[in-house]
């Protein structure tokens, strides 16, 4: 049976922005929480991608995230999600233990323009 969200997750109001993804239970480090899609959006002024699934659509940004985005390869393996991605299936994985009611976050920036 398809579930839009991992059973350990819920969507609710976020102090960061709008709605967010929260842990409904404690979640161990290195848990893959599900997939999200980055789809090509050619009609935008700046050729870019967007995420449109409950997991990808509601997870908020943090400079100190507790999750990372990893690319799902065609053979079912995973690899680092680096650079500008315009079409991919990605998974969200925890990089530290997450306690019940904690908001899950990822770093939106996958590249930097000057400076840091």
What are these regions (language model features)?
Residues 1-116:
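Conserved catalytic SET/PR domain of SAM-dependent protein methyltransferases, capturing the structural core
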